[in-house]
Each structure stands twice: as structure tokens, then as C-alpha cells.
Amino acid sequence: MSFMLALPKISLHGAGAIGDMVKLVAGKQWGKALIVTNGQLVKLGLLDSLFAALDEQQMAYQLFDEVFPNPTEALVQQGYAAYQAARCDYLIAFGGGSPIDTAKAIKILTANPGPSTAYSGVGKVKNAGVPLVAINTTAGTAAEMTSNAVIIDSERQVKEVIIDPNLIPDIAVDDASVMLDIPPAVTAATGMDALTHAIEAFVSVGAHPLTDANALEAIRLINLWLPKAVDDGHDLQAREQMAFGQYLAGMAFNSAGLGLVHSLAHQPGATHNLPHGVCNAILLPIIENFNRPNAVARFARVAQAMGVDTRGMSDEAASMEAINAIRTLSKRVGIPQGFSQLGVSKADIEGWLDKALADPCAPCNPRPASRDEVRELYLEAL
């Protein structure tokens, strides 16, 4: 079996990594940056260290802080217009998945005709575009180091998943010092998103030894440190360990692929503007229980990684404990336990079925699902 492991050219980790990145980029003389972020992050002062470092190096930049959760193609076009108007030369994304995905989509437009959603699917982006630095503030989507971007086509009310090595940032930055003030609910949702990445990658039909090692260690770290990061956001060790865990999960799914959890989660996220991590967290135990018969031995190893003492258990029993451990962690960090708590009704489901099955994440799922089975999974998640 052959496989590909694509990563950023440079990854910087740890407190102070933002300053290290700026010094590195200064030497490259890329020109003027468009900083793509969310206005709330600016108001919270999270970008102050970035601004100070850029100013110290006398590096030119323009701020685009209009990003919102679940970015749309219209937002991407707005960002690209800002890039052109300011005559920028490269991109710096600052935030979680939404700012980084927006910057990736803008990157597409710097070297390819629009819209960015035209490149939905795998390997359709012909030209790489300008350099991209991705500074991650959540743990998280791992968008700072993956080949994925998710942009909403508002007319069709669908999340378009763009997967291409040309979207991998040139420099990935995980600086835990800018993660300390992320609210508990966001910490919980993004952490469960990272757990979903790791588990889906581990049971994916595309899994291989390199992704297995990364996925299992990611599961172990997230299970251990996510509750601590939720309980005390200023626990720097917990934030750093979660940053490591989500990065390892990104390494795993960037090569092995994802599965039905993401395929199904993208639909309510698009139609109801729900947080991606929450959608994943609600669906994760339900869909992995559906997948379990096709990957019993693998789920037994997931249980071990989540701290379950499986000595004396059969793989079947241990695999069931993996599902229980997922549910326990989800409840522990305060994730809603059903979509009905978020304004979703049974009537919404029918419009999601075909889109979920057509999602690029679906083919790597270890157990194929029919349209009727997808409906039942959604109903169980209400």
C-alpha cells in the first residue's frame, strides 16, 4: 500500500512561537501581508503580540477582520477584494478553522479563477497561490497544517469541502499563549472536533502505520487534557498538550481521511449555522457505534487510548467501552447531547441525506451507509 503524508514546510510550537514566526518571515521578504481574522479576536487583544512583532520588524500588513463562523463564498470574495485593494503579497490567518479556511480560499483565488467553491472535492486546485502563514488559536481543527478548507455555498446551503495539497499553509503556528482566553464552550467544541479527527482517521479505510501512531497519541492526549483545559483555560500545560494533540490528529486525518461523522456534521452546520465541533461531538458516538462492527479491534485500541482498562476484555467488549468513553468525555465537557437542543427538527433531516452521502469525507468511512441508514443516524442524533 502506498500513501502520502503532506505537511507544512515549517511548523512552530510553544509559547512565543508567533514571535519566532515573524522573525522567520522577515527573512523571506515576502512583502505585505493580509491578516485574515475575526474582529472579536482583535477586540480581545489576542493579536497584540502579532502586531507588536510585525511592527518591530517594520513589516507591512493590512487587517481583514470580517471573518465569521462557517465562512461563505461571499466572505471569501470580500477578503480577496481586500487583498487586492491593499496590494498584498501573502496571507497570515489568525484564529480557528473559520479564519484559516477563509485565508485558504483567498489563497486559491490569488492564482486560480473563482469562486473558491468550484474546487470542492479532492485535488482540483491547479495553482498554489501566494504564501500562507496559519496561526492557530484553538485546539482544534488543525486547519493550520491540513490540506482542507470548508466554505459554505449559501445558495445551495451546503458546506463545500476543498481538499488539495496546495492549501497546506507554508508555516503553521501553534502558540498556546494565545489560546488561554478561549471560552470553555469553544474549548470543549474544538477539542471534541480534534478527537473526532483522530478517531475517524484511526478507523478510516485509508489508515496506515504513520497515521495510526499519530491518531492514538492524539486520542490519549485529548482525553487526558481536554477536561483540564475546559475547567481552567489559563492552564498553560493543558493548552499546550491540547495543541499537540490536535496537531497530531491533523497529521492523521490529513493522510488517512475522515468519515461519516464529518459528512453528516457538515449539513446542520450549513443550514443552521451550528458550531462544527458541536455537530461532530453529537454525532461521534452514534456514528462510531454504527461503524464498530466493521472495526472491532480498532475500537478496542481506541478504548485503551482513552484510558479504559481493557485487560481481560474481549475486543468486542472493549470496543463498546470506547463508545461509552466518548459519551462520557462529551458529557464531561458540556457538549449538548442532541441536535434538538440546538433548534433542529425531524423535518430538517430529509434535505441533508443526499448532501451527506455526496460529501468528500464519506468514502473513507469503514462502514458504507445507505440513505435510509443515514436518516436513522440523524434521527438518533436528535
Region spans (language model):
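An N-terminal, well-structured beta->alpha segment
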Residues: 1-64
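C-terminal and late-domain segments of enzyme folds
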Residues: 184-248, 252
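A glycine/threonine-rich phosphate-anchoring loop and its flanking beta-alpha core
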Residues: 111-207, 298-305
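N-terminal small/polar loop signature for handling phosphorylated ligands or for N-terminal nucleophile
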Residues: 42-115, 123, 228-239
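Short, amphipathic C-terminal "tail helix"
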Residues: 345-382
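Glycine-rich phosphate/pyrophosphate-binding beta-alpha loops
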Residues: 140, 247-280, 359-363
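Gly/Pro-rich interdomain helix-loop hinge
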Residues: 271-348
